[in-house]
Amino acid sequence: MLFQGKSIRVVALPEAGVFELVFDREGEAINKLDDRTVNELRQATQALANEPSLRGVLVSSTKDVFIVGADITEFGAKFSLSAPEITAGVAHSNEVFVAFEDLPVPTVVAINGFALGGGLEMAVSASLRVMSTAAQVGVPEVKLGLFPGFGGTVRLSRLAGPALACEWVASGKPQKAAAALAAGVVNAVAEPEQLRQQALDLLARAMRGEVDWQAQQQRKRVPVALPEADLQAAFVTALQAQAEAQVRAPHQPAARMAIEMMHAAARCDRAGALALEAKAFGEVARTQAARAMVQ
């Protein structure tokens, strides 16, 4: 056992140098990314980084879901802080996902059930993802007057492109496996009973150099790879659609704020884009809409 917490453990698998990071929230039916779990992910990632034999990491869940998102019961206290204080807290948490993303080996997530909000944000920090045909992924934060704050807007823009990323963030709708695969958010889909083996097979191929996992990671560290005209067109379309939506819901600014921030972040590297996301999250968390919807 490389690491044992109350929400996460890291165990060695039979193949030398391969470890499994398991989300298994003690005494609960689901996994959530509460403060304890994020802190344990920090410790687990450090343990993996310090392991000299490390060659690859499988990420899985023992629950019927992968991770359903953050623990909204923690939001009240957090959102009573000032916007700069909220931003600082988000930035501190984001260090965990950056550290996991920057492990020097391939990482593959087996998405067995719902991966929502922070659950999807954790998954897209890995190199590669295999998704069960029975699973769904998404970023539903807009339904709480928010938007993703753990790097979701940054990584989705670079994996799926800004148009689809804006659509996912602004709608908050869960997406099935076929849609996630077509969007480029996951790399493969599998029947539930074959998910683990397909994830292990993909990890083995990545470790053998047959899958360029490093290129998959690098694209999330650089600005969005689109010609300027295409980039501008994507955001003009997204902002027009959101302007129409805001006529129907004028007191819910989260989607518009997210798209405007994603537009600015698209030409930034990872660090710059994450900083913009964290700053905007601090601002949206202090809006009347967010305070009303997370109560």
Label each region the model flagged.
Residues 1-24, 29, 121, 125, ...:
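Amphipathic alpha-helical segments at domain termini/boundaries
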Residues 1-60, 84, 98:
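Conserved CoA-thioester-binding segment of acyl-CoA-metabolizing enzymes
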Residues 61-96, 115, 143-146:
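Glycine- (often His-adjacent) and acidic-residue-rich active-site loop
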Residues 94, 98-144, 148, 168:
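Glycine-rich beta-to-alpha active-site loop
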Residues 153-163:
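Hydrophobic, secondary-structure "cap" segments at the distal end of domains
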Residues 275, 279-291:
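Long amphipathic alpha-helix in the N-terminal Rossmann-like dinucleotide-binding domain
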